[in-house]
Amino acid sequence: MMPQLTDDFLLLCGDVIIDVNFNRFIAFHKAHKAWASLISHPNGHPYDSSLLVTEIMSPKEVGGMPEDTHRVIRWMNKEDERLYYKNRVNAGVEIISPELLKETMKNFTPRHPENPNKIDLDRDVLKPNIKSGKIYAYDTPEYVKDMGTPDRFHEAETDMLKGLVYARNLKNKQKAIFLDRDGTINKLAGFVTNPEQFE
């Protein structure tokens, strides 16, 4: 499987429209010394997408709030039974290390004996190597959309014309809402001295 590859490489599926800060993505990949880093995001059709489950460190382990390590511990294909899941979808944009390919070829058994060179990246390479602990999910709020159906293509085209694709890149300032622990949103009213001043 591509023995001439000696460096990590970026792989983009052809039906994805994306505008992300790739420097952040590359830094994440290097910091985790990953065999593969997968851009992940919530989408509008998780029922027909591969979902990623990542390791969560308990509050006892980290001394505070639960912490997501971003290490992928489970890969759910669209046909797998799903009782409960977080909408965290593999976007089809990955940084892949040659080590992942070498490890895959050590134990690779073709699922299609009639065509042994046919390899499915998700099912034959990424999913089987989760046990290595070196596959990571890079969550981003940036614009990532699978436009593999006519409806999704139209949505992506509309978003592009509205400027939404570019605007969501993290190199641009983003709008944010901060909530306190009970989820209350208060209007900024300066120094509040009694409850009647809250809006």
Language-model-derived ranges and their functions:
Residues T6-L10, I17, N23-K30, H41-P46, ...:
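Catalytic-core segments of class I nucleotidyltransferases/pyrophosphorylases
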Residues C13-G14, R181:
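Short acidic donor-binding/metal-coordinating loop in glycosyltransferase active sites
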Residues S50-V53:
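Extracellular disulfide-bonded cysteine-rich modules/repeats
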Residues K171-Q174:
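Short, small/polar residue-rich loop motifs at catalytic or cofactor-binding pockets
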Residues A176-E199:
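Alpha-helical substrate-recognition element adjacent to the catalytic core
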